[in-house]
């Protein structure tokens, strides 16, 4: 169907698209979880915020599972190296995610303020920790992860969890948190009225400012303060052996792709200006356009990171030759071909039933809605 090089590039694009859809869909329900203590002051208001995503949060989790499955199937070496290096971080994410279904399902079981406050805290933790950790992980990819391959292609991680928490990755974690809060704030603009609507408007404005500042600072930091990786020689159609290439580490090299192809600047421009356009849209009473702009922001930021790294997927800070690229970290050509056929069949189906569910369950959440559906809503 396609040659090996083309298949590898297609799967790089597909994983990027899956990450974007995850940050849009799961991003807004994690965003409302982070905003819960800021925009809701009593139990009715908290129930309105929670039920604004009550019909969708479980379906949104599919994209996280799909992203993990695609990473495992298409980039097994990346999966192995990442889970070796980020093991503690991934366990932290999984443990925090456990709070989300429990909080949604058990919060309303007992009409007790302390009980509900406990599960509200669990929902905040389960919504705040994953985006921060994912952002920190992406930040470490740009710095390089301390791992190496032996001549037998066994991966060895040579760092510790605390080494991941340096200033640049923490900045990326803050950027990721701002992105989901912005998406969640715009969602509340679409789904609520009254005081929650007004408070989420202010939260959206502040999140947009945070995203713009963090994104600008991260870009400048990459340009002047972080050495980038350059692929000097590798066969894009060759076997998936990470030791069969030449790699150099040079100052400012992460900007090379944008210098060589100026048209790619469209992605960082989207990442920087779309938060501003989001705020302009919601203050003009057009939250639908605001949600679109926030979604384009996710697209711009994520693909800016991907293009910056390209063709690297997981650089190594201790053994540059061990760095993983999309040319040497993939499954076999047959595996990629079979998976591509499966994705082309089932991904549109998933998208269609997801959009259908949003269409059928659309409508603003109000106090009257809670009263009419007292026994059905969270």
Curated annotation (Swiss-Prot):
Gene disruption phenotype: 3-fold decreased ubiquinone levels but no change in redox levels of the ubiquinone pool (in aerobically grown minimal medium with glucose).
GO MF annotations, alphabetized: cytochrome bo3 ubiquinol oxidase activity; electron transfer activity; metal ion binding; oxidoreductase activity, acting on diphenols and related substances as donors, oxygen as acceptor
EC numbers: 7.1.1.3
A Pfam family matched in the record: Cyt_bd_oxida_II
Superkingdom of this protein's organism: Bacteria
Induction comment: Induced when bacterial cultures reach stationary phase; synthesis is triggered by phosphate starvation or a shift from aerobic to anaerobic conditions.
Keywords on record: Cell inner membrane, Cell membrane, Electron transport, Heme, Iron, Membrane, Metal-binding, Translocase, Transmembrane, Transmembrane helix, Transport
GO terms for cellular component: cytochrome complex; plasma membrane
Cofactor: heme
Periplasmic side: 29-79, 143-164, 226-261, 312-335
Pathway stated in the Swiss-Prot or TrEMBL entry: Energy metabolism; oxidative phosphorylation
Subcellular location: Cell inner membrane
Cofactor binding remark: May bind up to 3 heme groups per complex.
Residue ranges crossing the lipid bilayer per the database entry: 9-28, 80-99, 123-142, 165-184, 206-225, 262-281, 292-311, 336-355
Biological processes per GO annotation: aerobic electron transport chain
Bilayer topology annotation: Multi-pass membrane protein
Predominant cellular place of this UniProt entry's protein: membrane
Regulation acting on activity, per entry: Inhibited by cyanide; is more sensitive to cyanide than cytochrome bd-I oxidase.
Reaction(s) catalysed by this chain's protein: 2 a ubiquinol + O2 + n H(+)(in) = 2 a ubiquinone + 2 H2O + n H(+)(out)
Family stated for the protein in its record: Belongs to the cytochrome ubiquinol oxidase subunit 2 family.
Function as written in the Swiss-Prot or TrEMBL entry: A terminal oxidase that catalyzes quinol-dependent, Na(+)-independent oxygen uptake. Prefers menadiol over other quinols although ubiquinol was not tested. Generates a proton motive force using protons and electrons from opposite sides of the membrane to generate H(2)O, transferring 1 proton/electron.
Binding partners and assembly: Heterodimer of subunits I and II.
Entry protein name: Cytochrome bd-II ubiquinol oxidase subunit 2
Organism from which the protein derives: Escherichia coli (strain K12)
Gene name of the encoded protein: appB
